[in-house]
């Protein structure tokens, strides 16, 4: 059973009891990410996430590591474009200590100047890793072109220039205005009792500043076009995509079914026609990225540089086919079954259930039950898939980016026509 409530401080708590397991995963989710940064402070949200593990006013970094190791637990965090998450998985008997550790991290970071300088170097190396990983880099270049005039287009890590300019004082100021009760969701799933956890949370977070949630940013608009980044590597990497619906859109499940048919499974059209039938690529797939007010559907392929134009032409053909013709009944059935199975299999652990609870609270403000989701997927028709494809796959908002050698034929905007 899922229980959700807002505590007097403004902090939101949502739990799901899973009596058949012995573990508990609890996460502290911050409803602020890289899209809420200014241009000058790009990367600050991710930098702060790193620093929370470098010591608090009551624990050193070593003591943090020793505490979680002594529990036999797992502690981790990540920063996304619309939120950040700090989470721990432990046996149920260790929940009080784990929650105390989490609250210490998100309420009392030290931001010691020496640690800030050292971690700054670590993050700059992390940025270089992306630059040296072309399959990651092409997605970054794609997002930067796709939403070139909006914070969603900026890299979560920031740029070398913005990260190098951030100081301990700037990190403290960002932390003070952002890490406040109304921005937090505490989500937990596993062998737990909601009332007992509520008492633990209230005690652990009783000094969390009330504050006020920050202002939202305006929805983004797409900048269509083609961007090529030359790299001396063995193959070319391609991203091609269009806008998609936001997270809570009424047609989101029809969009998920459409994406499954397009390129999100082994039997998908892109995988079969580009890899299996023609051997043009090892990796080829489509994926959806959805936010509170925007989204994008992206096709990725890694192929021989001289084959890029052929892969693009085949991809555009598949987009056109989805837009102009209804999918056959057997293909629709297979896509819906795949989507439902993936959903259920992906929510068997306490960690995945905790993340699901938190995202539901952040994007919907309520818990959408499994039965609701399964029924919504099952209700998708071939007409729905075609209607959504016709709505999303438009020539006036196509974006393509490539990362690869200079030897290949250059893509042009004129060649991007569905």
Per-region residue spans from a language model:
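Extreme N-terminal starter segment of soluble prokaryotic enzymes
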Residues: 1-3, 11-12
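Charge-rich, well-structured scaffold segments of protease-associated domains
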Residues: 2-6, 17, 54, 61-219, ...
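Flexible, small-/acidic-enriched active-site or ligand-binding loops
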Residues: 225
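Active/ligand-binding-proximal structured segments within catalytic/core domains
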Residues: 10, 17-68, 179, 250-262, ...
């Amino acid at each position: 059973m899922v229980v959700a409530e807002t505590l007097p401080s403004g902090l939101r708590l949502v739990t799901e009891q899973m009596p058949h397991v012995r573990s508990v995963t609890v996460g502290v989710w911050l409803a602020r990410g890289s899209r809420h940064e200014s241009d000058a402070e790009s990367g600050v949200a991710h930098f702060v996430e790193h620093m929370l593990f470098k010591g608090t006013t009551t624990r050193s970094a070593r003591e943090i590591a020793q505490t979680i190791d002594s529990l036999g637990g797992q502690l981790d965090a990540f920063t996304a474009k619309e939120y950040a998450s700090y989470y721990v998985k432990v046996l149920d008997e260790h929940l009080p200590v784990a929650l105390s550790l989490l609250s210490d991290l998100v309420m009392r970071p030290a931001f010691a100047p020496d640690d800030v300088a050292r971690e700054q170097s670590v993050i700059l190396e992390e940025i270089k890793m992306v630059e040296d990983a072309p399959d990651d880099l092409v997605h970054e270049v794609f997002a930067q072109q796709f939403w070139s005039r909006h914070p969603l287009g900026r890299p979560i890590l920031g740029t070398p220039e913005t990260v190098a300019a951030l100081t301990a004082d700037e990190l403290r100021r960002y932390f003070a205005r952002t890490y406040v009760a109304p921005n937090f969701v505490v989500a937990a799933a596993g062998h737990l009792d909601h009332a007992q956890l509520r008492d633990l949370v209230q005690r652990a977070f009783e000094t969390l500043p009330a504050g006020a949630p920050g202002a939202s940013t305006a929805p983004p608009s797409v900048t269509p076009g083609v961007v090529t980044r030359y790299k001396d590597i063995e193959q070319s990497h391609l991203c091609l995509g269009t806008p998609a619906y936001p997270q809570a859109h009424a047609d989101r499940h029809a969009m998920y079914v459409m994406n499954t048919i397009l390129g999100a499974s082994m039997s998908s059209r892109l995988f079969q026609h580009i890899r299996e039938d023609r051997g043009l690529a090892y990796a080829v797939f489509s994926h959806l990225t959805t936010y509170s007010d925007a989204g994008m559907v992206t096709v990725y392929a890694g192929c021989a540089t001289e084959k890029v134009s052929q892969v693009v032409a085949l991809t555009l053909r598949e987009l056109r086919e989805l837009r102009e013709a209804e999918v056959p009944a057997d293909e629709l059935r297979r896509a819906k079954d795949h989507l439902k199975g993936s959903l259920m299999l992906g929510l068997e652990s306490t960690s995945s259930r905790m993340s699901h609870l938190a995202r539901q609270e952040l994007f919907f403000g309520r818990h959408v039950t499994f039965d609701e989701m399964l029924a919504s997927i099952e209700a998708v028709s071939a007409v729905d898939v075609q209607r959504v494809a016709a709505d999303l796959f438009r020539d006036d908002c196509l974006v393509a980016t490539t990362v690869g050698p200079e030897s290949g034929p250059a893509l042009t905007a004129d060649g991007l026509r569905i």
